[in-house]
Amino acid sequence: MYCIGLISGTSVDGIDAALIEISGTELDLKIDLISGKTYPYPPELRGKIIEICGGKPISIEELAQIDDAIAQSFAQAAIMVQNGHPHAQLIGSHGQTVFHRPPVLGEREIKLGYSLQLGRGSMIAHLTGIPTVSNFRAADIAAGGQAAPLVPKVDAYLLSHPTHHRCVQNIGGIGNVTYLPPNQKPNWEQAVRGWDTGPGNVLIDLAIQKLTNGQQTYDNNGQWAAQGTPCESLVRKWLEQEFFQQTPPKSTGRELFSPAYLEQCWQDAQPYHLSDSDWLATLTELTAASIAQSYQQFIKAPIDEILVCGGGSRNTYLKQRLANYLPNSQILTTDDLGISSDFKEAIAFGVLAYWRLVCGITGNLPQVTGAKQAMLLGDIDHPV
C-alpha cells in the first residue's frame, strides 16, 4: 500500500512529506521510502505560525484563516510528493502544532492536557481526493496522556535490535527520545520508553535569527557554534530548571522554550561577556547536555547506539558534543539503518495512519505518554 506522511515540526521549517510503500503490521512492518521532500511554507504564513506559537493573541477569524492556509499547504505537499510516483491510497497528516499543554497532575484530580494542531484533515482529504487520518494526539489526551511523543511504537518496530539497547533521538525544534530495549527479551515492548528531552534546535534557531536580523534561520552544520566555547556554568544552571528534573512521562514545546525563555537565558549570560559564537556554542551545549542528562537520569541500561534524526542530525558540532557526553555509545543517524533521518517523523505518521485505518491497531504506548490505555489514534476523513 502507498501512503503519505505529512508533518511540520516545532521548528516550522516547512512541511515534510514522505511517500512510502508499506506492508505488514507490527513485527513484520516493512517500509520503503519512495519520495521524500520538504516544502517550505510561504514566508508570511510561516511568520504567522511562529507568532501564534509564541503566544500572540489573534481573533477566531484569523485562526480559521490560518487553519485553512495550513491545510491547503499540506494538501499541496501531498500532491507534489507524488509527482512521477505511484498514487497514494492514504494520507497521515500530523498538522502544525501551535499549542501544547501537558496534563497537570493535581493532588485530587488530573487536569487533562491540550494539544492543538492546525491544518484540518477534512480539507486535505477534499483537496487531494485521498482518505486522510489527522488529529492524532486527541485520543491520547482524552485518555489522560501527554500525547507526546507518539512515534515510539513506530520506532520500536522499525529500529529495535535483537541484542542492542538503542535510543532514537529526534532533534527537531524540541528533542525527544525513544528508548528501545533488545527485542529478543520477553515482553520487550513493555520496556519501550519515550519522552521529550528539552530544546532541540529551537533556541539555537531563535538566536541565529536574532544575530543575523532574520537573514539566517539556523546554524548550518553547527559551524558558527563550533568556533566558540560553551559556558559550562550557564549550562549547569539551566539544567537545574524544573522541566529537566521532571520524571517521564513528560512533554514540552515552544510554550516553554520560547523567545521569552531565550531572553532570560541571554540575561543569565550577560555577566560572562560571551562572544556570538560562544553564545551559540552554549545553547548547543544545552541541547547536548540535556539529552545526555536525560539518559543518565531515566535509562538504567547502558546505551549501545544513539540513532539521531531530525534537523539536528545534520549538525556535526551538536553530534560531537553529544558524543562527548556519552562516550560509550555509538552515535549514528537513522540513515545508517535505512530510515531517512530527514523524513522519519513524516514516515511515522504515515505508519500511524495505516495502523488506524487499515489495521485497526492502537498507536500510542501508555507507558510512554501516561495514557490510561492504548488508543486508536486519529480522525478519519474521506474525500467528498
UniProtKB/Swiss-Prot annotation:
Single annotated GO MF: kinase activity
EC number, as in UniProt: 2.7.1.170
Coiled-coil features, chain-numbered ranges: none
Gene that encodes it: anmK
Enzyme class: transferase
Record: residues binding ATP: G9, T10, S11, V12, D13, G14, I15, D16
Record-given protein name: Anhydro-N-acetylmuramic acid kinase
Species per Swiss-Prot/TrEMBL record: Rippkaea orientalis (strain PCC 8801 / RF-1)
Reactions listed under catalytic activity: 1,6-anhydro-N-acetyl-beta-muramate + ATP + H2O = N-acetyl-D-muramate 6-phosphate + ADP + H(+)
Superkingdom, natural source: Bacteria
Keyword Transferase: yes
Entry keyword set: ATP-binding, Carbohydrate metabolism, Kinase, Nucleotide-binding, Transferase
